[in-house]
């Protein structure tokens, strides 16, 4: 799967950049019996449906021209906004999220949990500081960057 994601990322990045959009993420997943190629794009102020359709048309045209086809099976191409809970993947994503409420999944437990939600206070090249509510007490938790399996913005209720 990663070769599909890498190929599509390399193909889509210049198309997205040409329109001054950001390619947030690319996924190639099977759900039920169907395969989905998903591109998440964004720009300051948010992306609209016409912009998603534009990128979808251009990426689809480029994908159809590739020989050999990197995706031999049938699939659905979806281009959309990353939404309110956008993933944090690149260092720049984390830098933009300082001060925001985020969800972090870890490879192994730190303390008593593999999942934390809290406000991202600061980050370094090696770690991030997260202000979390642990049983009614506000604590600052330092999480090594290499312990983070996934991170995304979160909505605080």
UniProtKB/Swiss-Prot annotation:
Superkingdom classification of source: Bacteria
Keyword Cytoplasm: yes
A GO BP entry: ribosomal small subunit assembly
InterPro entries: Ribosome_maturation_RimP, RimP_C, RimP_C_sf, RimP_N, RimP_N_sf
Cell location: Cytoplasm
Keyword Cytoplasm: yes
GO cellular component, one term: cytosol
Entry keyword set: Cytoplasm, Ribosome biogenesis
Pfam families, sorted: DUF150_C (PF17384), RimP_N (PF02576)
Disulfide bridges in this chain: none
Role, per record: Required for maturation of 30S ribosomal subunits.
Similarity-based family: Belongs to the RimP family.
Name of the protein in question: Ribosome maturation factor RimP
Source species of the chain: Levilactobacillus brevis (strain ATCC 367 / BCRC 12310 / CIP 105137 / JCM 1170 / LMG 11437 / NCIMB 947 / NCTC 947) (Lactobacillus brevis)
Gene transcribed to yield this protein: rimP
């Amino acid at each position: 799967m990663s070769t599909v994601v890498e190929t599509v990322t390399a193909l889509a990045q210049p198309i997205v950049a040409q329109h001054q959009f950001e390619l947030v993420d690319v996924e190639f997943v099977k759900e039920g019996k169907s395969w989905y190629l998903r591109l998440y794009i964004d720009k300051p102020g948010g992306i609209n449906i016409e912009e998603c359709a534009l990128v979808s048309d251009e990426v689809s045209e480029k994908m159809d021209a590739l020989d050999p086809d990197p995706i031999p099976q049938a699939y659905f191409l979806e281009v959309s906004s990353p939404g309110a809970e956008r993933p944090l993947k690149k260092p720049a994503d984390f830098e933009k999220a300082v001060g925001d409420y985020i969800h972090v999944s870890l490879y192994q437990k730190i303390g008593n949990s593999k999942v934390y939600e809290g406000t991202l206070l600061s980050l370094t090249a090696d770690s991030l500081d997260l202000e979390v509510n642990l049983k009614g007490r506000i604590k600052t938790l330092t999480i090594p960057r290499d312990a983070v399996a996934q991170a995304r913005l979160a909505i605080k209720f």
